[in-house]
Structures are given as structure tokens and as C-alpha cells.
Curated annotation (Swiss-Prot):
Residues 16-167 form the PPIase cyclophilin-type domain. Belongs to the cyclophilin-type PPIase family. It is found in: Nucleus; Cytoplasm. InterPro entries: Cyclophilin-like_dom_sf, Cyclophilin-type_PPIase_CS, Cyclophilin-type_PPIase_dom, Cyclophilin_A-like. One of its GO terms (biological process) is protein folding. Ubiquitous. This is Peptidyl-prolyl cis-trans isomerase CYP57. The modification N-acetylserine is found at S2. One of its GO terms (cellular component) is nucleus. PPIases accelerate the folding of proteins. It catalyzes the cis-trans isomerization of proline imidic peptide bonds in oligopeptides. Involved in plant response to pathogen infection by increasing PAD4 expression in absence of EDS1 up-regulation.
Length: 504
């Protein structure tokens, strides 16, 4: 079996086929058989194989399914018809658990049916498209499927094994979009619910059925509306129920109209009272208000709102005691503005814009603007705080240029060359005596260059050792000396042996 795993290409994609005999894990080869794998995976996602039977089982050979009709001749692919075979040189029917497409005993006739092999099937090579294999212990569930009882035409006997559902754990094609399949006529008919029929009481089965039936009739008569002689007799002098209903509706409509008229009259009276109160608070009781211009009307409305807020007690909150003390002055100024034309309207708009662009110099000016501007007083507490925050923010925005200029000047002073006016560096050593602090000029501290005298011993090149005093160790020289010494000892020994002896 080791040669099988070496020759077969790696898989990509996994599907679990849940059957009545247990789950079957199927791994796919989308690179080697892209059309077949795409067809199989999309049909699984659409639930095409759910509750379909294995219509053909041959023990020791194969288990075939994928036909929704269960006849062995049905089934359709996602391409709208049959599609071509896909053969690969490294995919063969060399062992059990191979998953391949079933065809109509002719090439390029693949649909939706597929089969699992139960053993080695060499004679099917190059005839059926292989697109997957069964992995893990689920191969034993497949073998149990192959052991079911079958008839003479290889059809499993009842109950036939089924595909309950299919789960796609790893989809090799991310662009697959499941289709919305049309429902069959049987399913649509089952979904149409019949209207519930009212059950009929079978009173004849009871011993007291006749009495119960009479009671039912009496109740039915009581439920009916009681009719008067006006409705029963056909007399034109008598009014029918319809006529009385019409009169009742007419009277109701009249009541509604009268109520509406009363409400409208109340609204008009309230508006008149309101207009009189406005004229009283402003102080203009004359009837010739038509010639009043829009500016005066705006001033009147502002003063009216301010007076109403004073009566309610909703005065603008002051952040400091200074603002509280100046609240009386603000009220006096507001009353003076109400007598004459608003000074706010007489000021040119360009002056106000220049004030906004320049920003307000201090919080005192901001307080002055708050008292002077009647529009700001009309705001509530939160809105007024937000407007003041905007003014302060606008004031701070004008100081950015000056702050940046000061920062740049400081950088230039720091980066100046640390030399004195005589362009001679001042050397400070650790042994220098301290100078009197009273006579020291602190303005020249940036012109000082800190420099220390070099310490001996730290500079490796300042040693005074004699290079000839170093001892040189040469291993080869030492080895040669040893050899020379041995030769000298041997020569001396030889001389001692031949000493005192003649050559004759």
C-alpha cells in the first residue's frame, strides 16, 4: 500500500456523506478533475443528494448512488447536461475506496451519479473519471454498505441504504454559488395546507343527544339579532334599521363638526391673547403695527424670550462671581436695547467678522461679548458653553505662529557653535579650580566646549614596551630543536661507544 500513497497526488477538499450505515469521509482531487469535483461539491451544497438511495450495490465491486429518482437512469449535472471525462495518469482503480463518476456506458456521458469501489478494479481505468477517495475508518462503513441484501438486478432490498445528508467541510472552489432548485409538484402540494374544517358534533351517539340538539338550536336563535316590527313589516310608514343608522351617523358627524369648530375658536382666542401679551411686554399698545420693520420685531421677540426665561428662573449660569455680579448690568443693558433699535443691528457686520477672526483677548472680553450679544443669551447652558469654547479655540489658533517662531529661535540658539568670541576653545579639566559664583557670567555657558585630558593606559597605542622583549613561541621551531637534540645525543653516544677501540 505504500506505493499507492506515493503515486497518488495530494488532495484538496473534504466532504462527509452521512448514510444510514454511518458517515463516509471523502477527499477530493480538484486539480486533476476540476469539472467532476465542481459538479459534485455544488450538488452537495444544494442538497441534491439528500434522502436519495443507493440504487445499485454489487458485493465486492461497487456501491452506486446520486440518482434522485432512484431508478438508475435519472440525475443531471450543474452544467445542464452531460460533461466530458477527465483522466489522469496518477489516478487509477488500484485499491478500494475510490470515488468515480458513473456514465451511460459511453464516453463523455457524466451526470450526477457516482460510485464507491469495494476492491481493486483495474479494468475501469481510462473509462470512468476518478475525483476522490474514502479515507480513515469510514472505509468500514462503506464495506458494510456493500454487504446489504440485493435482488437479481443488483438492486438493494427494502429498506435500501440512503444518503441522509452531505456536509462540505472543505470547499476547494470558493466561487461556487448554490442554485435555488425548483420544488417538485409533490413537495409543493404537501406544503399547501387545506383550510381547517369545523368538526361536526355527532349528538346521535349520546343517550341524551336529542336534548343537546334542542339546546344548540335555542342558542343559535339567541345569537341572532332581535328584529323589531319596523324591520319585519313592509310598511312605508315605519322606519327601518338602516334609516335609523343613517340618522345616527348624521348626528355623530354634526357632533364632530361642532367639536372641531369649538377647538378652532379656542385656538384663535389663544392666538389673540398671545399677540396682546406680546404687544404689552414690548410696550407698543398702538394698533398701527403694520409699519413695523423686521429688525424691531426681532428685538421684541428676543426681549420677550429673555423676560419669559427670567420669570421661569432659567437664567444663564455664570462660571465666576464676577459674572454673577455683572448680571444686573446685563439686564439693564437688555432693557435699554428693548426701548430703542438694537445696537447690535446698527453695528456693521464687518466689525463683528474682524473680531471673530482676531479672536478675543481674554476671558473678560469673552464675558463682555456674552453680555452684549443677545443671540448668545438665548442659548441654553450647554449650547452657550459650546459657543464660548469655539471662541477660545479660535483665539488659541492665532498664537500658533508665534509659538512656532519662538521654538525655531530656541533651536537655532542651541545649535550654535560652542566657541567664544576669540574662537579659542575653553578647556575644562577635572582638576580646575571652581570660579566664584558671584563673578561668573552665565551668558557664556553655551560657548564652552567640554574637554578632558587623556588618561594613560586607556589608549592601547600609547604603550612604551619594547617589541624585542616579547617572547615568540614557534611550535615548528620547538619540534626542530627536539629533533636536533636527539641527533646530538645519538652522536655523542656513538662517540662514547667507539672511544678507545681500534678499527683493526
Amino acid at each position: 500500500m505504500s506505493t499507492v500513497y506515493v503515486l497518488e497526488p495530494p488532495t484538496k477538499g473534504k466532504v462527509i456523506v452521512n448514510t444510514t450505515h454511518g458517515p463516509i469521509d471523502v477527499e477530493l482531487w480538484p486539480k486533476e478533475a476540476p469539472k467532476s469535483v465542481r459538479n459534485f461539491v455544488q450538488l452537495c451544497l444544494e442538497g441534491y443528494f439528500d434522502n436519495t438511495i443507493f440504487h445499485r450495490v454489487i458485493p465486492g465491486f461497487l456501491v452506486q448512488g446520486g440518482d434522485p429518482t432512484g431508478s438508475g437512469t435519472g440525475g443531471d449535472s450543474i452544467y445542464g447536461g452531460v460533461f466530458a471525462d477527465e483522466f489522469h495518469s496518477r489516478l487509477r482503480f488500484s485499491h478500494r475506496g475510490i470515488v468515480a463518476m458513473a456514465n451511460a456506458s459511453s464516453p463523455n456521458s457524466n451526470g450526477s451519479q457516482f460510485f464507491f469501489t469495494l476492491d481493486k478494479c483495474d479494468w475501469l481505468d481510462k473509462k470512468h473519471t476518478i475525483f476522490g477517495k474514502v479515507t480513515g475508518d469510514s472505509i468500514y462503513n462503506l464495506l458494510r454498505l456493500g454487504e446489504v441484501d440485493t435482488s437479481k438486478d443488483d438492486r438493494p432490498l427494502d429498506p435500501a441504504p440512503k444518503i441522509l445528508s452531505v456536509e462540505v467541510l472543505w470547499n476547494p472552489f470558493e466561487d461556487i454559488v448554490p442554485r435555488v432548485l425548483a420544488k417538485t409538484s409533490e413537495e409543493s402540494a404537501a406544503e399547501i395546507k387545506e383550510p381547517p374544517t369545523k368538526p361536526v358534533k355527532k349528538l346521535n351517539l349520546l343517550s341524551f343527544g336529542e336534548e343537546a340538539e334542542e339546546e344548540e338550536k335555542e342558542l343559535a336563535v339567541v345569537k341572532q339579532k332581535i328584529k323589531s316590527s319596523h324591520d319585519v313589516l313592509n310598511d312605508p310608514r315605519l322606519l327601518k334599521a338602516e334609516a335609523s343608522d343613517k340618522e345616527r351617523n348624521a348626528s355623530e358627524s354634526k357632533e364632530v363638526l361642532s367639536v372641531r369648530e369649538a377647538l378652532n375658536a379656542k385656538k384663535e382666542a389663544a392666538q389673540k391673547d398671545k399677540s396682546f401679551s406680546v404687544s404689552d411686554t414690548v410696550g407698543n399698545s398702538d394698533d398701527d403695527d403694520d409699519g413695523e420693520d423686521e429688525t424691531k420685531f426681532d428685538a421684541k421677540m428676543r426681549n420677550q424670550v429673555l423676560s419669559r426665561r427670567k420669570e421661569i428662573g432659567d437664567t444663564p449660569s455664570k462660571p465666576t462671581q464676577k459674572k454673577k455680579s455683572s448680571s444686573l448690568k446685563g439686564r439693564e443693558e437688555s432693557t435699554q436695547r428693548s426701548d430703542a433699535v438694537s445696537s447690535e443691528d446698527e453695528k456693521p457686520r464687518m466689525e463683528k467678522l474682524s473680531l471673530k477672526k482676531k479672536g478675543i483677548g481674554s476671558e473678560a472680553k469673552a464675558e463682555h461679548m456674552e453680555k452684549g450679544d443677545t443671540d448668545l443669551q438665548l442659548y441654553n447652558a450647554s449650547e452657550r458653553a459650546r459657543q464660548l469654547h469655539k471662541l477660545k479655540k479660535r483665539r488659541l489658533q492665532g498664537n500658533e505662529d508665534s509659538v512656532l517662531a519662538k521654538l525655531e529661535k530656541f533651536k537655532q540658539s542651541i545649535s550654535a557653535k560652542p566657541f567664544t568670541s576669540s574662537n579659542e576653545p575653553v578647556v575644562l579639566t577635572s582638576s580646575s579650580e571652581p570660579v566664584d559664583n558671584k563673578e561668573e557670567d552665565l551668558s557664556d555657558w553655551k560657548n564652552v566646549k567640554l574637554k578632558f585630558a587623556p588618561e594613560r593606559g586607556k589608549d592601547k597605542m600609547s604603550r612604551r614596551d619594547d617589541p624585542d622583549a616579547y617572547m615568540v613561541v614557534d611550535p615548528l621551531l620547538e619540534k626542530g630543536k627536539e629533533k636536533f637534540n636527539r641527533m646530538q645525543a645519538k652522536q655523542k653516544r656513538r662517540e662514547r661507544e667507539w672511544s678507545g677501540k681500534s678499527l683493526a
